[in-house]
Amino acid sequence: MIALVVGGAKSGKSMFAQNLSKSLNESLKNPISGQLDGEIEREVGKLYYVATMNPYDLEDLKRIENHLREREGYGFNTIEETLNMSKVSSLIKEEDTVLIDSITSLVTNYMFRGKEFYKDVSDDILSGILEIINNSKNVVIVSDYLFSDSIQYDCYTENFRKEIGVVNRKLAKIADTVVECSYGNIIYHKGKVI
């Protein structure tokens, strides 16, 4: 299962994605019936949280602290990786459930590496995420929705928005489910209600 969860800041998207990831992973614990010796348990994968934010200021650190508190008790194994999704892919197995939070942070990290500005980053990001998708049972991906205003931004910001848009569109195309979180409301754009 591939799910893309989008929304604005403080929309509830991360909490929704955490609950969805946990639910998908727990659904793998259902026993397989009809075996000779009764019921047997399926092999259950691990639940991973891929934290992609590279904190730049106090607000980022507070957001990270909040996310850590929110996911206490969920059973996530946290992987902190700000760029290399191929490295993440090498750590997971085909029965695992992976939550990637977030595309927005990945685009930021790729575009502003060191003192350079990298304009075209979507292919590199998608390549790493596709590796994770191909190596795991379930992937839930969080991304921001940054396209509802009508303000013209500088060329760097416009390019940033374009790259997020490219990644979001391509992920939405391959996702089984696409969900938008808005003011705590859940809107399904693709797939079934989970």
Model-found features: residue ranges?
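Portal/gating segments that form or line small-molecule/metal binding sites
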Residues: 69-92, 97-113, 119-123, 133
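Short, functional N-terminal and low-complexity linear motifs
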Residues: 12-17, 55-56, 97-100, 132-139
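Conserved P-loop
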Residues: 2-91
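Generic beta-sheet signal
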Residues: 1-5, 47, 96-106, 139-141
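Short secondary-structure boundary segments
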Residues: 53, 102, 143-145
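Residue-level signal for inorganic ion chemistry
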Residues: 17, 67, 99, 144, ...
